[in-house]
């Protein structure tokens, strides 16, 4: 008979917080609550649940920290500022969070993420995942690139760059560019132009395009040079990019399903509209 250690039965929890005072206070309270509770085991290396404390930026960092463990990790966010799109709890709801995790039945809410494949002229292939968005830009000169959707050349783009976002990322940079807001359960990508050049000679669609899950997007630069590619909040520079491919990843991000889950449209209202004046 194999003897079972209490850690085999306990829920393994990682607590990730930003450097703000209030976030540290919440983290300290959670550490103290979980440290001697047999239902939980603190494990930053191999967690079942990752608690992100801060804002949406902190959750993006937590996602990339555990993106190789997405099959077995669920996330939960605690916001120490105003309401965020990835957070279900406020800093004063720590006791509610602990109680809900004690009664957790393993249910989850899943959202699609972005698969990014960058091919360079020397044959190197760089693969990455994005929770919100990815952009490609050519800073010093106008970017010229073919936009290929599902192997069909859709347009030749001229402008500052192109953004591809997930539904959860549609409320971020995409919205500031005039893109549509998509509900996060929709498995689709959104392609949005960044300062496209439109005149009598050069034309682009000039509006966002919603791409279904089964289709892929290719951006094929037509000029040599250094390109700036962002993956969420990280930016890299590559010389002579042959193409960059975007599609819905086979994995998804999973959040702990909680009774206090705030609806997406409430979050949109809170972030961009607010209470009407009377």
Curated annotation (Swiss-Prot):
<feature type="binding site">
    <location>
        <begin position="56"/>
        <end position="57"/>
    </location>
    <ligand>
        <name>NAD(+)</name>
    </ligand>
</feature>
<dbReference type="InterPro" id="IPR017438">
    <property type="entry name" value="ATP-NAD_kinase_N"/>
</dbReference>
<keyword id="KW-0067">ATP-binding</keyword>
<dbReference type="InterPro" id="IPR016064">
    <property type="entry name" value="NAD/diacylglycerol_kinase_sf"/>
</dbReference>
<keyword id="KW-0547">Nucleotide-binding</keyword>
<feature type="binding site">
    <location>
        <begin position="132"/>
        <end position="133"/>
    </location>
    <ligand>
        <name>NAD(+)</name>
    </ligand>
</feature>
<dbReference type="GO" id="GO:0051287">
    <property type="term" value="F:NAD binding"/>
</dbReference>
<dbReference type="GO" id="GO:0006741">
    <property type="term" value="P:NADP biosynthetic process"/>
</dbReference>
<dbReference type="Pfam" id="PF20143">
    <property type="entry name" value="NAD_kinase_C"/>
</dbReference>
<dbReference type="GO" id="GO:0046872">
    <property type="term" value="F:metal ion binding"/>
</dbReference>
<dbReference type="InterPro" id="IPR002504">
    <property type="entry name" value="NADK"/>
</dbReference>
<keyword id="KW-0418">Kinase</keyword>
<keyword id="KW-0521">NADP</keyword>
<feature type="binding site">
    <location>
        <position position="158"/>
    </location>
    <ligand>
        <name>NAD(+)</name>
    </ligand>
</feature>
<dbReference type="GO" id="GO:0003951">
    <property type="term" value="F:NAD+ kinase activity"/>
</dbReference>
<feature type="binding site">
    <location>
        <position position="160"/>
    </location>
    <ligand>
        <name>NAD(+)</name>
    </ligand>
</feature>
<dbReference type="GO" id="GO:0005737">
    <property type="term" value="C:cytoplasm"/>
</dbReference>
<dbReference type="InterPro" id="IPR017437">
    <property type="entry name" value="ATP-NAD_kinase_PpnK-typ_C"/>
</dbReference>
<protein>
    <recommendedName>
        <fullName>NAD kinase</fullName>
        <ecNumber>2.7.1.23</ecNumber>
    </recommendedName>
</protein>
<keyword id="KW-0808">Transferase</keyword>
<comment type="function">
    <text>Involved in the regulation of the intracellular balance of NAD and NADP, and is a key enzyme in the biosynthesis of NADP. Catalyzes specifically the phosphorylation on 2'-hydroxyl of the adenosine moiety of NAD to yield NADP.</text>
</comment>
<keyword id="KW-0520">NAD</keyword>
<dbReference type="GO" id="GO:0019674">
    <property type="term" value="P:NAD metabolic process"/>
</dbReference>
<comment type="similarity">
    <text>Belongs to the NAD kinase family.</text>
</comment>
<keyword id="KW-0963">Cytoplasm</keyword>
<feature type="binding site">
    <location>
        <begin position="171"/>
        <end position="176"/>
    </location>
    <ligand>
        <name>NAD(+)</name>
    </ligand>
</feature>
<dbReference type="GO" id="GO:0005524">
    <property type="term" value="F:ATP binding"/>
</dbReference>
<dbReference type="Pfam" id="PF01513">
    <property type="entry name" value="NAD_kinase"/>
</dbReference>
<feature type="active site" description="Proton acceptor">
    <location>
        <position position="56"/>
    </location>
</feature>
